[in-house]
Amino acid sequence: MREAARVLRSGGLIFAAIITRYAPVRYAAKHEPALILKEREGLEQILGSGVSLARPGVGFTNAYFAHPSDLTPLMEQNGFEMLDLIACEGVVSMIDDQLNGLAGDLWQAWVELNYRLGKDPAVHGAAEHLLYVGRKKG
């Protein structure tokens, strides 16, 4: 964030996405339910600290999974003001296959509802990714 703040001019826009602390739980539930037992220690480390260290054969890099409440203060500390914070998956994540088959007004109604609810802070903890839209102060 410091580098973004350094190179962005005053009033410039920043779009920053994070993977949330709970994304690995959602991934495990959907794709590999046995991970809750096989990788319990790693999962608990992520839930507690957000830190995940790469392990041979696992296929994911070192990562920090942020708690949703950490993003706005981090951005403010680096000179940005929040314009929007959106849960990228929204409330229809994991059930989107059925909705993707819709068309016309019915599709649009679901898109609009999902987008609106994605801005609700209560939904942010259930999202896998958050999109921060901000402006550099000054």
Place the predicted regions along the sequence by residue.
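Accessory recognition modules or surfaces
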Residues: 39-54, 93-104
